[in-house]
Amino acid sequence: MTAIRDANRAKIDGNDRLGKAVSAALQDAGVQMARWMRPGGSGVHVHTGGSWVKVFWWYATEKEQRTAPVPWIEENNGGVRVEVAAALLHAGFRFTDDGADFALTYDNNRHV
């Protein structure tokens, strides 16, 4: 039982490190990051939970969600998603793209 718990803890800790490393890489690349509950705070959010790290566009307020443009998938060269993918690749991260979000796992990114 202890071995299972230790393995789960190691995965959780690895995903936490991965989420922080992904956030840092995106910030270093100049990607517009989300700022919680602030007008004009919409941006890319890195969510760490369970066995995945997810990267997606997050609107800071409901008003922005209804009225702001959708830079995540803009027609002009793919929008912010293209920036995020390039930054992740440049930083050496392996990820999957489900068409909406990017997903990363510690198992595929043990270098963090």
Please report, for each region that a protein language model flagged, where it lies by residue.
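Functional cation/ligand-contacting sites centered on basic and imidazole/sulfhydryl donors
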Residues: 23, 67, 71-73, 85
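Generic hydrophobic/packing signal
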Residues: 17-18, 83
